[in-house]
């Protein structure tokens, strides 16, 4: 290796499958290069063959910049505009550490976040994070707005993340969250939730396997994510009773039928466990993007606005995507959801169906898309316009 940190060489050899004083095939070399580049530990990785018979392999790497500043802007027909600023500083001392700041200003959601990571190696980190969020949130039910809430959210996290297996990430840790509601305005007699300023201490674990070749419009691969959270207000109980927990599962695959046509089946859901549940963690469904306004929000074609569902939710989704003329795409999505307060009676729950037809252009500034959708949760055709990356 040339240009790498000596402390990195052992794990670089491990993840790439390379061994000193051994022979490799061209296929094995290409695979090792893909792994090293995909590790994102260095800004560039290349190789050359030396020796009289070109029998010696030399890998060269270029270190990443110590610091960076990034800016993003997006527009959509719901929030109107969102602006994101991110700055990172990489301190290459004995123990690598990274400090990052992210700020977002938008029509519905604004936040400021600090992240600090101590790297045992570039794929194993101890993480500290704090985020302050202001949220102006509308909640709907069957297409009609039922209430609006404005609140601030303090979020602190200590965790350990491990990405030392190819395409697999594991994370666990401890979180503290505090919700301070400025107001909670109901329409009519829809005052079914008792909400107050409240703090929560939770334990969490998450595992994510992903082999997609692209973040947007992937052409191959799978994504399988499972997460579990255990909520308390004093480390052991909640409101003097047993704590509650949440389990989430999300699976998506890309089936390339031809070079231009793909089918993307998905199955995802979330289950709340316990009888003493808190409002901020109830199941939320709607929108095109997972976690748009609250982390547990599940997307659903045909429901543009966020709605609260029962304690157990399962969604099956089938996405047909046709690429036309370069970076232009036509998408047809059908999905079905079922929800019930009791997981063991989920099949007796409420049925929700919906679908959408959309066009998207994959631009350098992010996806530019327009979507028409409908479902049995509302009586009118819905329209959503998006310009830019999701954040």
Regions found by a protein language model. Name each.
Residues 166-168, 259-261, 326-328:
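Secondary-structure transition into beta-strands, especially the periplasmic turns and strand N-termini
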Residues 261, 267, 273, 350, ...:
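Predominantly the C-terminal beta-signal and adjacent terminal strand-loop region
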Residues 319-353:
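C-terminal hydrophobic structural anchor segments
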Residues 1-3:
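A short, amphipathic beta-strand motif
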Residues 6-8, 17, 22-216, 285-299, ...:
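Gram-negative/organellar outer-membrane beta-barrel architecture
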Residues 68, 73, 200-324:
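C-terminal outer-membrane beta-barrel translocator/porin domains of Gram-negative envelope proteins
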Residues 133-135, 177-179, 227-235, 270-274, ...:
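Short glycine-rich beta-strand segments
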Residues 146, 304-307, 341-347:
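Short, glycine/charged-rich beta-strand-loop motifs at protein surfaces that mediate ligand recognition
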């Amino acid at each position: 290796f040339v240009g790498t940190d000596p402390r990195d060489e052992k794990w670089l050899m491990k993840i790439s499958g390379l061994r000193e004083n051994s022979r490799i095939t061209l296929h094995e070399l290409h695979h090792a290069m893909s792994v090293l580049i995909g590790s994102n530990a260095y800004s560039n990785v290349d190789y050359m063959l030396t020796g009289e018979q070109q029998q010696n392999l030399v890998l060269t790497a270029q270190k990443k910049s110590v610091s960076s500043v990034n800016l993003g802007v997006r527009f959509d027909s719901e929030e109107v505009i969102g602006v994101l600023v991110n700055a990172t500083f990489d301190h290459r001392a004995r123990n690598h550490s990274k400090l990052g700041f992210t700020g977002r200003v938008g029509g519905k959601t604004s936040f400021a976040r600090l992240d600090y990571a101590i790297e045992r190696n570039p794929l194993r980190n101890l993480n500290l994070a704090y985020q302050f969020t202001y949220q102006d949130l509308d909640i709907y039910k069957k297409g009609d707005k039922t209430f609006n809430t404005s609140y601030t959210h303090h979020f602190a996290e200590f965790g350990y993340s491990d990405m030392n297996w190819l395409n697999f990430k594991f994370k666990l840790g401890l979180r503290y969250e505090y919700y301070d509601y400025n107001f909670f305005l109901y329409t009519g007699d829809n005052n079914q939730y008792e909400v107050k300023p409240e703090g929560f201490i939770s334990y969490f674990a998450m595992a994510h396997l992903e082999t997609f070749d692209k973040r947007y419009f992937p052409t191959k691969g799978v994504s399988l994510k499972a997460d579990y959270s255990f909520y308390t207000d004093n480390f052991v109980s909640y409101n003097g009773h047993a704590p509650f927990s949440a389990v989430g599962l999300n699976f998506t695959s890309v089936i390339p039928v031809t070079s231009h046509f793909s089918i993307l089946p998905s199955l995802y859901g979330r289950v709340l466990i316990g009888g003493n549940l808190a409002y901020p963690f109830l199941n939320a469904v709607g929108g095109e993007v997972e976690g748009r306004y609250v982390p547990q929000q599940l997307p659903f074609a045909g429901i543009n606005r966020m709605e609260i569902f029962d304690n157990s939710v399962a969604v099956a989704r089938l996405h047909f995507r046709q690429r036309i003329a370069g970076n232009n795409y036509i998408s047809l999505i059908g999905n079905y959801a079922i929800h019930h307060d009791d997981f063991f009676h989920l099949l007796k729950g409420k049925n929700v169906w919906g679908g959408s037809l959309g066009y998207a252009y994959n631009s350098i500034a992010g996806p530019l898309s327009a979507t028409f959708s409908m479902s049995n949760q509302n009586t009118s055709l819905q329209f959503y316009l998006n310009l830019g990356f999701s954040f």
